[in-house]
Design a protein with these regions (language model features):
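Catalytic machinery of carbohydrate-active enzymes
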Residues: 1-362
Length: 362
């Protein structure tokens, strides 16, 4: 037992390790020589980011920094959607009772809790870690774990501070973790190709129009007539247009596809959705999961925004943010509160089309 290398990246403790199954090696051979596959783990790092899939994707730039600063580390990530995590995460963990029990029973060198959800902060309090950053609980109240998280904390409890913020989300979370953001990009594994290839011409530039923004956020909706007009205008300019969306957008997209005579392949799994986005050269989109997929796949983007602070978004030089010509008072509000008008009615098709043309230029 004394010769077991439990600090090896391949050691499991419950089943034979990969090198043993493949090469029949032991941690130390009969001559006392260590296994040639021995890979000692440095820091054990746990990220807690449960939330929405888009939030998980836009947190992945941290992985690049962590692997740069701690190349021998083993990174664990606890989330509601482990299937979206890239291969750079050594140990993806679903937010389930078995996972929680295990994490509560083992030590970490560094814990990064980037969620303010009470369950995430409660778990962060209970896990044994030499260093904790992000958010935690104090007498049942969510508070910053260190001074580095105070500014991000304040933007979440005071609207005026949030509106005045000029830092992007990656800058904020890097600062929370004690790092400086240097343009580290999203980490998103290439999507699986569809069993049946998408029926796209292959000769034209493809523009995807993601028409939805979630049922809750009606303040962000752009009218169907605008999407239809934009699709027609893009077709006239020689682009191939494909509509994107989930189950909530199915009826809308079916209607727009018929009216504008553009392609719509229906809604499917997240992997298939990502595969279709990957075929696009440019995506026009509101602030949604699809926005983060688009950025993660390195596609050009025109982002429609009205209720969020535009400084929050890091587009990595991939596109533009377009906003209504009239001021919007619906900051973080799910329904429009502007007296007398809906601000999204003052985001013209011509304005969005011009942005598409600018973004698509070499």
């Amino acid at each position: 037992m004394a010769t077991l290398k439990t600090d090896c990246r391949f050691f499991r403790g419950t089943v034979p390790c990969g090198p043993h199954k493949k090469h029949q090696v032991h941690c130390v051979d009969e001559a006392g020589r260590p296994c040639s596959h021995y890979d000692r783990i440095g820091k054990e790092i746990l990220i807690i980011k449960l939330g929405a899939i888009g939030d998980v994707i836009r947190t992945t730039p941290l992985l690049r920094k962590l692997k740069d600063v701690h190349p021998d580390s083993r990174i664990w990530w606890l989330t509601l959607t482990p299937e979206i995590l890239p291969k750079l995460v050594d140990e993806p963990m679903a937010f389930t009772l078995p996972s929680i029990l295990y994490l509560q029973s083992r030590p970490f060198d560094l814990l990064l809790n980037l969620d303010k959800d009470r369950e995430a902060c409660a778990l962060a309090e209970q896990i044994d870690a030499k260093e904790k950053k992000g958010f935690r609980l104090d007498k049942g109240i969510v508070v910053p774990a260190t001074a580095e998280s105070e500014q991000k904390y304040l933007t979440g409890i005071f609207d005026d501070i949030s509106k005045a913020n000029t830092k992007s989300y990656p800058v904020e979370i890097f600062e929370m973790c004690g790092f400086q953001f240097n343009g580290e990009q999203y980490v998103l594994d290439a999507p699986e190709p569809p069993k049946t290839p998408w029926t796209l011409s292959g000769k034209k530039r493809v523009v995807g129009l993601n028409t939805g923004c979630g049922a809750r956020w009606t303040s962000r909706l752009w009218a169907d007539k605008n999407w239809t007009a934009l699709a027609r205008a893009l077709k006239r300019k020689g682009y191939e247009v494909v509509l994107l969306g989930g189950e909530q957008e199915h009826a809308k997209n079916t209607k727009i596809a018929r009216a504008a005579k553009v392609k719509y392949f229906g809604h499917s799994s997240l992997q298939m959705f990502m595969s279709l986005v990957d075929r696009c050269d440019l995506v026009v989109i509101a602030v949604t999961l699809a926005m983060h997929v688009t950025i993660g796949l390195g596609k050009k983007i025109v982002l429609l925004n009205n209720i969020f602070n535009k400084h929050e978004f890091e587009l990595y030089g991939l596109g533009e943010i377009v906003e209504p010509s009239k001021p919007c008072r619906c900051f973080f509000k799910p329904t429009c509160v502007n007296p007398g008008y809906r601000c999204m009615e003052h985001l013209s098709v011509e304005h969005v089309l011009s942005a598409c043309v600018r973004v698509r230029k070499p």
